[in-house]
Amino acid sequence: MASQYPGHQLDDIPSTNVYRPPPRHEDDEAEHALLHQNSAYQSQYDDPHSRPLTPGQESVYTLNESYVGGDPSKVPVTSYNPQYTQPYGQGYGMNNSRPGFPTPGPPDPIDRTDSTEAWRERQAPGFGTIKRYATRKVKLVQGSVLSIDYPVPSAIQNAIQAKYRNDLEGGSEEFTHMRYTAATCDPDDFTLKNGYNLRPAMYNRHTELLIAITYYNEDKVLTARTLHGVMQNIRDIVNLKKSEFWNKGGPAWQKIVVCLVFDGIDPCDKNTLDVLATIGVYQDGVMKKDVDGKETVAHIFEYTTQLSVTANQQLIRPNDNDATSLPPAQMIFCLKQKNRKKINSHRWLFNAFGRILNPEVCILLDAGTKPGSKSLMALWQAFYNDKDLGGACGEIHAMLGPGGVFGRKLLNPLVAAQNFEYKISNILDKPLESSFGYVSVLPGAFSAYRFRAIMGRPLEQYFHGDHTLSKTLGKKGIEGMNIFKKNMFLAEDRILCFELVAKAGSKWHLSYVKASKAETDVPEGPPEFIGQRRRWLNGSFAASMYCLMHFSRMYKSGHNLIRMFFLHIQMIYNIVSVLLSWFSLASFWLTTKVLMDLVGQPSTSNDNAAFPFGNTATPIINTILQYLYLAFLLLQFILALGNRPKGSKVAYIISFCLFGLIQLYVIVLSMYLVVRAFTTKNGTDIVTNEGANEFVKSFFASTGPGIVIIALAATFGLYFVASFLYMDPWHMFTSFAQYLLLMPSFINILMIYAFSNWHDVSWGTKGSDKADVLPSAQTKKDEKSKTAVVEEVDKPQADIDSQFEATVRRALAPYKPPEEKEEKTLEDSYKNFRTRLVATWIFSNALLAVAITSDSLDRFGFTSEPLRGPAISSRRFCGLLRPCL
């Protein structure tokens, strides 16, 4: 028979129940589990007739159907259930004329070119059917708060293990219904007093660990990677056998809450919502854009699920006979109606949900960051074992693709350089700062805080960066700040760290937890990389200056004398770091020029032998490279002040390559200098055969190469020694060379672009924030109770289940990355023409000036005049001026 789902068919399930889709990634955990007979994904509970059904919700739907395409002539046949014939009277039952088949779901929009438009259509009441459903009356909490329980699809209910379904509080709908709340208030007003509540608090559960995932517009692969990693970490905690804490006072999973905060409906990827709907945390068609005309600020969904979707779209289900099954996870999904930025998302987390749940520890993750095995438990243990620990972070490393430490993404030098940066930061910077007690930045992508430690002034100062509070805060708000403070909040996590350590009367400290690891995706192209580092560099510089200027507040804290001594040492270290960063532009140029002059100019110090191209060619090549260096340095200012990185991609790629080639040349010169210093017997080189005193004198002589050797030893030796001591040296072999070649670009391109765009603080909303597609909720007075009620559509379970099939197909469909269109806008073309015009004008005039005034021109052999200095410059100028007159 023809398929009722055009364009995407369902597979028959073999009677042996050992079907598995073709693997997409051989190293995926779900794929390995599917290869074993006793795995959590091939159990007897995959059979819809072998598992006890949820009481009162008899259904033929389970999650054992395959949604990956197959024989178009076949669809799964399910038994006919008379329960759904006329549950609400005539006109509301199953009108399917084919007994034995489920009610046809809506057309599958997965092959639609615009998933957002398909999502908008699904929000309409009664989408996918021409039937009229019965309605139910829902009371508003305290007459103003709309909070409704919706039945979840039977397949999701049936996936819950019996031991959890049977161990519920009386009358609980935790596993059978999803709870939706339309929050029409500010996060600060999301309180019990105003009628808002959350399920863990309603069930009187203590929340020990609140895991928050902040999201902007990441695709479903990145989101699933993070969420599945969190589910695996919850399993690690629940499976602890000898824990003195987690196994007391109730099941461990009831002490953990996972909170997803999505920053706006418009920017979010609608395929990601399908993934959340597949595990039961979201449903289409239930959100309300306003309640009695009062705009909804955030849509809050709550459900406890045992399902998970991996990064390669494999559905993970539990098995009663397997200890590796995922335990239930209490989920809170907060979908903000408008894009209000990350700080506002954290205000929902801490001020709204945190105050109701009152967790002990909050772990912050960005969508796309995957926590490693037992990483979240390692973070929590650090807090459990240290009562004065206020914040902590783990090791973040770059995502390198298949192959682990030798992943194929390392072929991209930009990724390799970032990988080296992350590794060295985790080996040298973080442990050093952790020993002082103050880690200058706990990355927002992977960090943890003790909730009561950040309450009060730390969060108060942190939330000054929330532009939704700008009117309330006045001059202290983001709109009243000067440009320096606005940039400071681009690195808001640094502000929170400083305020936490400097909290008056407290002695909280920060720490780095080596055992906790996470991987994150990094930019792979120059435009994205430059844009990311603009925010990082400007924010970190402003935040560092803020911390140094307000260091005196440390004296009001409760730290002891030893801690204060080390904090002073760290302050001096930070001052030196800021100064070195400030003068790094000149430092790189001076290093390049001095090394070229030392090795490339024939002189008595090098036995009148220039290296590497001989006495004639080497000075010429060095001069060309030096002028190219300065020219491209000037070009960076022109590009940064007038162009977007995406509009000048080619120019930036050429700049990266040129600075890399010059750096390679300088490295060769420095190596030659070191070798020559120990092998020649020139008086200006290092003396190795006349005793220690002469060796020291020659090594540190003003004309000797000792300082170069020290710099090289500090660069090469320190990194190698520290990496091997850390037992993690692989980045030295796979990424060190790329990092060395890109070091000048990090200064000459990134810092110039960042400081040239200091005015760009990127505040304000992105996108159009369209929520007009959502229906409104209008209250009516109930004739009997005289209270405000809302009439809500009451769908039969059969229709919920049939529509769920299309949702799962969309969620588990192979991910196809969107094609990036690099079409330049008209404004980009105008800016590029302006850049070329200005660059041509400046460089042509500079070339003329250099040709007349510089003695370096003689090296090219264009003139044999014996004159030097002003005399030759005057003669050249007059010679040029004569034909003009």
UniProtKB/Swiss-Prot annotation:
Residues 23-34 have a biased composition (Basic and acidic residues). InterPro entries: Chitin_synth (IPR004835), Chitin_synth_fun (IPR004834), Chitin_synth_N (IPR013616), Glyco_trans_2-like (IPR001173), Nucleotide-diphossugar_trans (IPR029044). One of its GO terms (biological process) is chitin biosynthetic process. The keyword Aminoacyl-tRNA synthetase does not apply. The chain crosses the membrane at residues 565-585, 620-640, 650-670, 707-727, 735-755, 837-857. Belongs to the chitin synthase family. Class III subfamily. Residues 36-45 have a biased composition (Polar residues). Coiled coil: none annotated. This is Chitin synthase 3.
